[in-house]
From Swiss-Prot:
Keywords: Cell outer membrane, Cell wall, Membrane, Secreted, Signal, Transmembrane, Transmembrane beta strand. It comes from the Bacteria. It is found in: Secreted, Cell wall; Cell outer membrane. InterPro entries: Autotransporte_beta (IPR005546), Autotransporte_beta_dom_sf (IPR036709), Polymorphic_membr_middle (IPR011427), POMP_repeat (IPR003368). It is a peripheral membrane protein. Residues 1-18 form the signal peptide. The keyword Transport does not apply. This is Probable outer membrane protein PmpE.
Amino acid sequence: MKKAFFFFLIGNSLSGLAREVPSRIFLMPNSVPDPTKESLSNKISLTGDTHNLTNCYLDNLRYILAILQKTPNEGAAVTITDYLSFFDTQKEGIYFAKNLTPESGGAIGYASPNSPTVEIRDTIGPVIFENNTCCRLFTWRNPYAADKIREGGAIHAQNLYINHNHDVVGFMKNFSYVQGGAISTANTFVVSENQSCFLFMDNICIQTNTAGKGGAIYAGTSNSFESNNCDLFFINNACCAGGAIFSPICSLTGNRGNIVFYNNRCFKNVETASSEASDGGAIKVTTRLDVTGNRGRIFFSDNITKNYGGAIYAPVVTLVDNGPTYFINNIANNKGGAIYIDGTSNSKISADRHAIIFNENIVTNVTNANGTSTSANPPRRNAITVASSSGEILLGAGSSQNLIFYDPIEVSNAGVSVSFNKEADQTGSVVFSGATVNSADFHQRNLQTKTPAPLTLSNGFLCIEDHAQLTVNRFTQTGGVVSLGNGAVLSCYKNGTGDSASNASITLKHIGLNLSSILKSGAEIPLLWVEPTNNSNNYTADTAATFSLSDVKLSLIDDYGNSPYESTDLTHALSSQPMLSISEASDNQLQSENIDFSGLNVPHYGWQGLWTWGWAKTQDPEPASSATITDPQKANRFHRTLLLTWLPAGYVPSPKHRSPLIANTLWGNMLLATESLKNSAELTPSGHPFWGITGGGLGMMVYQDPRENHPGFHMRSSGYSAGMIAGQTHTFSLKFSQTYTKLNERYAKNNVSSKNYSCQGEMLFSLQEGFLLTKLVGLYSYGDHNCHHFYTQGENLTSQGTFRSQTMGGAVFFDLPMKPFGSTHILTAPFLGALGIYSSLSHFTEVGAYPRSFSTKTPLINVLVPIGVKGSFMNATHRPQAWTVELAYQPVLYRQEPGIAAQLLASKGIWFGSGSPSSRHAMSYKISQQTQPLSWLTLHFQYHGFYSSSTFCNYLNGEIALRF
């Protein structure tokens, strides 16, 4: 027997920065281990009378099994009177399936007036309740009691606790006739500290004239999911009210896995319309809902209700401090496409740690018998409907986070206040955007948030972009920035008529024009508009409105509220570029002449230049009669357009974008090639011809200090080599090597991982009968590199890139061997050399955050002239050995520092970097030891490097040679 289970696949997690829409949820089948190997015939693993259990402790059993049990009383398999505990059931788990009762508790139940508690905890194996039913399909009168309701398709108890279980817990395809398709408790249902996933799927309860609440769960007092370590799934559950959960109080707090409410639904009453309303496609609560402190992703997707709240119906909602949260494609027939709030206490929705996104949530407005809506009230997008008469709605976002509404919200009562980013630490963005509205639905009803409620912005950003419209009666900005992007509309309107009317009022302090959004191809400039008053579809300009721009600071920003000069292409000059439109009832009604433009030309990174500004004014002719104006767009006669002119003057990248890391890769290549050229094979002339093979390992460490305002780096290399040697009077060697390198930028996590493949040839000439030794060395190296950049200052973003490099080098050394005092064991040799390196890298483009492209403008060229002395000591025992010590001064004769052209793709700004150069003067050293244990076997060890005011380099090489 295999029980059907599932997992879900979700697209890439959002960081909370981008205006993105997440992927949909995909469900796929997966199998769960059998709870038991026993037969699936009519069977129960418990012996004795299971229908009158009092203080029953079922501890440490191998398994618990109840299949195809039937009873005319409460609890088809188990009936309890006081307390029932399933504790420490072993790995075959707990399995209740296909049990049936015409009363309450399809598997486990109780009879009044008892009030028992059920506890399932510390189970090792899976806990499965499947296909249990409490349903009375015919009228049946118990002669000893009144007709009873039928609730709890799987479990009916006063209190239920499911805690500390180790394997999956699943309630699937359970059915009740009244409430709690899977679980019904008169008081409390608690799920806490479970280690594996928790599943409610395909549970259902249908409506009677008594109730019809909770497709999966009904709790009479409270329901909580706390501190669970894995995922919580609510899939395909159905009921009249609360498609998955119905409870006065519901909380999901401190859970570490993902939380998914998918395709739950509230259908229409089947018996009477006077019963519980069909609200809350996923959750309906009558007091409050708390979703706080959860670390995984939260999805409310494709939930449906016949009435209010496509996903959630609640008097009070607290949705704060969670992982990425998405409300996608939820549907309500009347109001509240995703969330419906109708209480008078404060509700709070805040994207504190990750983004919260509302997208494609719909109010269908179906009224016709054929399931369609009227043309006067067609379907529309709606994220949240607030029907409260008083209270406060708090909407906010933490630092660098976004609360994004791709669907409008509705606050219908002026007694409710709406506060954006009220708390001081809420410095993120609350975004109204029409970016996901397709052309077929591009209508004001899907773009406009219109409310008589007073709105206040205290901190952070209130963003209106991509043709979204915010129409208010009263709006006050005490802090933060009102960001206006492509096609944004911020307007005010007079609410009501006569003496009870509330005049329009908007007070702003700081407007940020989203430069990258306004300048993109096909974009429209934002609009500030005093809406005319409407009297029987005749429109009159509202001269009484107060919409003040006096002393308002105007600045230019990007999508994230930052300086736009590194995210916008300002390569070319802009002449009289329209940036903001104003439509007003009287000349200078908005006092736009007094806007503070001092924020335009401030010091910044990115494109440098100068902004100048001016206004283009137009005035429509006065109509013959105001009664003839039937188009609200034509009621205002006075219009202004802000024109900005930009004169570019170069580009200065910010430190986080400069990235000396790529140029430092060439410096690393140069250092590795330099030490490889100095890594002599210690060839010596021989009295007879010979040839041989060599092989060995190498390691290198470099510490480069910061130089010229560039951070230094640490480099570690290791690898191996193999080659051949041959010769007599003159010798020749050829060596191939592969090295693995990790270059880390100092004081940062940025790094480059490399593989270098090298070929090196060496020739030694003995001239003037050994008086002069001349060595020629050549090298070619090819490198594969992977770079990683980390943006850690409040962003936690990364970028990656792959590129190649080529390095060529050559060296010549002249030695003058001398034997002081006629000794045959001691040799000294002054030497002079010249060593040149050329290195360049390929063009490449990063992927990830702030992508850039890099290419070599000028390659790195470095020429050294080492001059020094070496000394050798040799013995001629049966195991000949030679020790060599070398000390040299190596100045740079010529250097062309690398010029790496970097371009930030968002702004198309280009700059050049040379990395962190090493000092031009250094002292090098070398110690080597060579042993010949056999006539045909030579062991060779070398340690060398150099030290300068900027760089400390160490190179270690061990090699074995077989001569024939």
